[in-house]
Each structure stands twice: as C-alpha cells, then as structure tokens.
C-alpha cells in the first residue's frame, strides 16, 4: 500500500495538503443571556414602553392594582443574598441581621448579633431566610451569619469572639417579639375601627382569621359569595395559639363575615408582620 494511504480517510479532491479536511470548531457563544445572566440578579429591570398603545397591548387596560397586592410588594423589594445559602431573594422575604452594641449584661463582649423586625439601612447588615426551622437546625452556625462589613456599626476592630451569638434571639424570642408587635398593632386598630364605616371587600384585600378548621395558614381565595367575586389573601393566625390574638380577630376587630378585612395601603405594617410571623413559624 502506498505511503499516503492515511490521506484517503481525511482528504478531498486530489489528496494534497491544501485539500485536507479541517477540524470544525463550534463558535464561542457571546449571547449575554448565557454569559452574563448571573450578573443580572439584584438589578432593577424596567420595561420601557412610551407609546400608549404599546402599554395597553402589553399589560391591558388594567394596572392589576399591584400597589395593593401584598405578594407583588414583597417580590418588588431589592434583592439580597441569603448568608446561609448564598442565593439571592427579595429582601422582604428574609430576616435582616445587624450587630448591636452590647451593654453591661454581657461583660467582655462588644456586640450582639440581632434579628431586626423593622429593617434598617446601612452596610453592616446580613440576611438569612425567614424560617424557624433553619435556626433550630445545626447549620448554619450563627458565626456564619455575622455581617461582613461592620464599618458603620460603631464598633471597630471586632472579632468573632467579641460577639454574642445567642440562638434564642432568633427562635423563641424573635417569635415573641413579632407576636407582641402584631398585638400592639391590632390594639391600635381597635380604637380606629370604632368610628369606621362598613367595609367593602375588594381584590387583594387581606383577611385575618383565627380558624382551626382551616388547615392553611396562607391562601389566595376568590370569594364567589360576595359581589364582584373579589380575590383576597387569607392569613390564618391559628398557629400562634394565643388567646389575646384569637379574641382580637374573632371578636373585637372582626368587621366582616369573612374575618378581619385589611387594606394593604392602610394596614401595611400589620399585614407584613402577620405574613412574616406565619412564614417564620412554618
């Protein structure tokens, strides 16, 4: 056999070097959808439609009343990284943690890692999923949740050994503080409701209940028995097993046959607190 027999398997034409088959290469993908997608998290994306007809075609004639929608407002909050999982979530679905200067009750310690019920601005914050189960487990350790930046906390040259890491602050005590804030808001609402007019249930209203016959804590329901079949968010507080809360919801605050009807734009703080407690307690 001739010496050029190998060329028979790769050659075209006359079998010369110039006619050898070249190895095909797949072009490198340059689409930002694939190369830069991980960089988009946390950045606001605005759909800019300047023409009125374009807007109508995209979203219809209704704005869907998203400003009154609890879920829409939660999802619209800025993205933050969960310190435990490293995934990003809307901030209002997480617990914010800060280092707070310690008083005389903890000698030798400079700061305490605290969960915050009311979120505060500042760089010295970290976030973790709003879940009691996470803190009752062995992982993550609280040391992993300490904010990286402590520059604006008023504490300089701090190390992990200088920080009080008390798990009870993130479990029973956090739950108790949430419940106390909810009860305070409800008590204030009792005085406000004394002179209020009869309520009309509308889309995206939040209905508070204390119903052991309902297995769901959070549910989206269309009330077909009411005019215009409004879609409402029901938050059932039976999980707290608290007589004061039960009396407030089933007696003092009840303003409709379906329960305590709240309007997001008027009762936003109470609604957010209840939703946070229910999510935390699951």
From Swiss-Prot:
Cellular location(s): Mitochondrion
Keywords assigned: Mitochondrion
Would the keyword Coiled coil turn up in this protein's UniProt record? no
Please give the biological process terms from Gene Ontology that the record holds: mitochondrial genome maintenance
The UniProt entry, under InterPro entries, shows: Rrg8 (IPR031415)
* Domain of life assignment: Eukaryota
Q: Which GO terms describe its cellular component?
A: mitochondrion
State the family named in the UniProt similarity comment for this chain.
Belongs to the RRG8 family.
Give the protein's biological function: Required for respiratory activity and maintenance and expression of the mitochondrial genome.
| Designated name of the protein | Required for respiratory growth protein 8, mitochondrial
Which source organism does the UniProt entry give?
Kluyveromyces lactis (strain ATCC 8585 / CBS 2359 / DSM 70799 / NBRC 1267 / NRRL Y-1140 / WM37)
């Amino acid at each position: 056999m001739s010496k050029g027999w190998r060329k028979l398997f790769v050659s075209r034409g006359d079998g010369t070097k110039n006619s050898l088959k070249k190895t095909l290469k797949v072009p490198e993908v340059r689409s930002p959808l694939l190369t830069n997608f991980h960089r988009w998290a946390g950045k606001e994306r605005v759909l800019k439609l300047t023409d009125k007809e374009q807007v109508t075609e995209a979203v219809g004639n209704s704005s869907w009343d998203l400003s009154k929608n609890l879920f829409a407002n939660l999802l619209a909050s800025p993205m933050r990284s969960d310190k435990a999982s490293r995934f990003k979530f809307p901030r209002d679905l997480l617990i914010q943690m800060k280092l707070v200067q310690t008083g005389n009750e903890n000698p030798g310690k400079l700061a305490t890692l605290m969960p915050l019920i009311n979120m505060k601005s500042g760089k010295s914050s970290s976030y973790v999923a709003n879940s009691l189960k996470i803190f009752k487990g062995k992982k993550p350790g609280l040391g992993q949740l300490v904010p990286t930046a402590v520059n604006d906390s008023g504490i300089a040259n701090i190390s992990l050994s200088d920080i009080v890491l008390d798990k009870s602050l993130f479990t029973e005590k956090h739950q108790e503080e949430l419940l106390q804030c909810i009860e305070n808001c409800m008590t204030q609402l009792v005085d406000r409701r004394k002179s209020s007019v009869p309520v009309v249930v509308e889309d995206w209203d939040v209905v508070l209940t204390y119903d052991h016959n309902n297995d769901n804590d959070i549910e989206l329901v269309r009330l077909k028995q009411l005019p215009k079949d409004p879609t409402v968010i029901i938050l059932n507080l039976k999980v707290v097993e608290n007589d004061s809360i039960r009396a407030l919801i089933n007696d003092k605050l009840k303003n409709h046959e379906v329960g305590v009807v709240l309007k997001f734009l008027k009762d936003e703080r109470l609604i957010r607190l209840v939703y946070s407690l229910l999510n935390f307690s699951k």
